[in-house]
Swiss-Prot record:
Record family assignment: Belongs to the insulin family.
Pro-sequence residue ranges: 64-110
Organism listed in the record: Conus imperialis (Imperial cone)
Intrachain disulfide bonds: 35-123, 50-126, 62-139, 125-130
Protein name (record): Con-Ins Im2
SMART domains the UniProt entry points to: IlGF
Length: 140
């Protein structure tokens, strides 16, 4: 069974406009930015908001409704120096911390698993420049 395109111009135009409308709707329903290893390797955006500044700003913006605080909590690290954990023979093989962490995938909602790149507040506001309205999306 061969697939044929509609021959009449109004039907084809309607089909193309419908596909365009569906594509535009998909853009508005997702995150505005996606970060890949290349994005992260360039570092923070010159106008990006990162680290504690990002946590403080979201905390102030979301005060009436609150926000999900575990986005900003730092995992506790061991108190021993790194030399006690690393064999001296492996020093030339190991990656630096930033590069090694770039290979770890953050926990993502099931709906976004399997997509290329990562998304989230750090991607949107640190590695890219986010707007006031994008920040408000992280409030409860």
């Amino acid at each position: 069974m061969a697939l044929t395109w509609p021959s009449s111009p109004p039907v084809l135009l309607t089909l193309l406009l419908s596909l365009l409308a569906l594509q535009l709707c998909a853009v508005y329903g997702s995150y505005e930015h996606t970060c890949t290893l290349a994005t992260r390797s360039r570092g923070a955006h010159p106008s990006g908001i990162c680290g504690r500044n990002l946590a403080r700003i979201v905390s102030v913006l979301c005060t009436p409704r609150g926000y999900v605080s575990n986005w900003f909590t730092k995992r506790s690290a061991p108190n021993k120096p790194a030399e006690t954990f690393v064999d001296q023979n492996l020093r030339g093989v190991l990656l630096n911390k930033r590069e090694a962490l770039s290979y770890l995938r953050p926990r993502e909602p099931r709906a976004t698993r399997g997509t290329f790149g990562s998304q989230g507040i750090t991607c949107e506001c640190c590695f890219n420049q986010c707007t006031y309205y994008e920040l408000l999306q992280y409030c409860n």
